[in-house]
Amino acid sequence: MDRIRLIASDLDATLLDAHSQLPPDFVPTVKALAALDIHFAAASGRPLYTLEEMFPALRREMILIGDNGGAVRWNGETLFTSEMPPEGWRTLARKTRQAGDVAVLCGLETAYVERQYQQYDAVMKQFYTRVDYVDDLTAVTAPADKFTIYLPRGNAQEAFDALYGPACGAEFSVAVAGKNWVDIMNPGVHKGAALAALGQKLDIPAGSMMAFGDTYNDAEMLETARYGFLVENGSLPLRQRVPFLAPPHWEQGVMQVLKQLLAQGGAVCPEDFRPAH
């Protein structure tokens, strides 16, 4: 049996429901995990300031992994940030503008979007509770840990394959984040690296880690934890890369596994779960 001590979960299309809402019993579940000395981390492409506003009742219990691993905060202390070089993201901004896509510079305190794309404000505010609209993104001087591209037509995978992967993959960490987003971070920055760093800091081995996700920006995280779960609604090719499947997010699949873990006192073995392949 393995005793789980650290759990990380993606949010959109994983922990959250179809309306981007948390399960109603999420807060008491995390508190019950904490009582068993099990840490819970929200691992998201959203920034830290948005995550803090999402979990006001769990600021002491939860670890926050923001911007796909670009920043980590626990109990009010920022443990890690990976600031992108300005010359790098300015080049990305020009490339995105030429392609006709929407660039989002993820600053540590706010997101920056060019004013010509203010029509997408409702979409931006779903993920970035602070957005500053500027005339020219390349003129921004604030530190940033992620550069995100919004694809309104839902063609993120195609844009990644044709343009952003080949053009940026050698210099940056690039990942598709659902149908509408491509995320770009410093090389080596992803949710899996953040989870591994947390494991080192807390002295928790991979065999005592559990993780949940649905798409490609979760892949390394699901491979880092021994108990990595792809929710059933997740990207099909990832089933070959992860050990286990959880029920889909609309059935609160993450919560089903967490409740099973609690019922077993925090101890599990691989035979307890449905294999992904």
Residue ranges and their predicted role:
Residues F26, L51-F55, A159, L163, ...:
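Hydrophobic packing residues within well-ordered alpha-helices of enzyme cores
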Residues D2-L6, L22-P23, D183-H277:
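Mg2+-dependent phosphoryl-transfer enzymes with acidic/Ser/Thr/Gly-rich catalytic loops
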Residues A57-R60, N68, A167-A170, T224-A225, ...:
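Short, structured coil segments at secondary-structure junctions
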Residues L33, S44, N68, F147, ...:
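Residue-level signal for inorganic ion chemistry
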Residues A35-A41, R60-M62, K146, G207-M209, ...:
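Short active-site oxyanion
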Residues M1-L11, L15:
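Extreme N-terminal segment that seeds HTH/winged-HTH DNA-binding domains in transcriptional regulators
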Residues K95, A99-M221, N233:
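Conserved acidic, metal-coordinating active-site core of Asp-based
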Residues Q21-Y120:
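Active-site phosphate-binding/coordination module
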